[in-house]
Swiss-Prot record:
Subcellular location as annotated: Secreted
Record PTM Valine amide, positions in chain: V11
Location (main, coarse): secreted
BP term (GO), one: neuropeptide signaling pathway
Assigned keywords, A-Z: Amidation, Neuropeptide, Secreted
Function: Mediates visceral muscle contractile activity (myotropic activity).
Organism: Blattella germanica
Protein name as catalogued: Periviscerokinin-1
């Protein structure tokens, strides 16, 4: 994951 609309896990 990443910093998006829904950050899942790692940012």
């Amino acid at each position: 994951g990443s910093s998006g609309l829904i950050p899942m896990g790692r940012v």
